[in-house]
From Swiss-Prot:
Species whose genome carries this gene: Mycobacterium tuberculosis (strain ATCC 25618 / H37Rv)
GO biological process: detoxification; positive regulation of growth; regulation of DNA-templated transcription
Keyword Acyltransferase found: no
Protein function: Antitoxin component of a type II toxin-antitoxin (TA) system. Upon expression in E.coli and M.smegmatis neutralizes the effect of cognate toxin MazF9.
Entry's induction text: Mildy induced (5-fold) when grown in a non-replicating state.
MF annotations from Gene Ontology: toxin sequestering activity
Entry keyword annotation includes Kinase: no
Protein name: Antitoxin MazE9
Quaternary context: Forms a complex with cognate toxin MazF9.
Keywords: Toxin-antitoxin system
C-alpha cells in the first residue's frame, strides 16, 4: 500500500539521519521501523523488568558457570 504523509523539515531531517545511522535503505524502511516500535511500546521496560527479576532470583552464579564453557558469541 502506498501512503503519503506530510512532515516538517525537522522531522524529515531526523528520519534521514536515523536511516543513515541505522544503515536502512530508505525513508520507508525508517518509518516501518518506527511503526514496529509503536506496536510494542512497553518492550524496553518489559526487558528491563525481566532482567531485574532474573538478577534478584540469585541465578547469576549458575549462569556465569554455564556461559564460561568457551563458546563465544555467534556471528550475526
Amino acid at each position: 500500500m502506498k501512503l503519503s504523509v506530510s512532515l516538517s523539515d525537522d522531522d524529515v531531517a531526523i528520519l534521514d539521519a536515523y536511516v543513515k545511522r541505522a544503515g536502512l535503505p530508505s525513508r520507508s524502511a525508517g518509518l516501518q521501523h518506527a511503526i514496529r516500535v509503536l506496536r510494542y511500546p512497553t518492550l524496553e521496560d518489559d526487558y528491563a523488568n525481566a532482567w531485574q527479576e532474573w538478577s534478584a532470583a540469585g541465578d547469576t552464579d549458575a549462569w556465569e558457570q554455564t556461559v564460561g564453557d568457551g563458546v563465544g558469541d555467534a556471528p550475526r
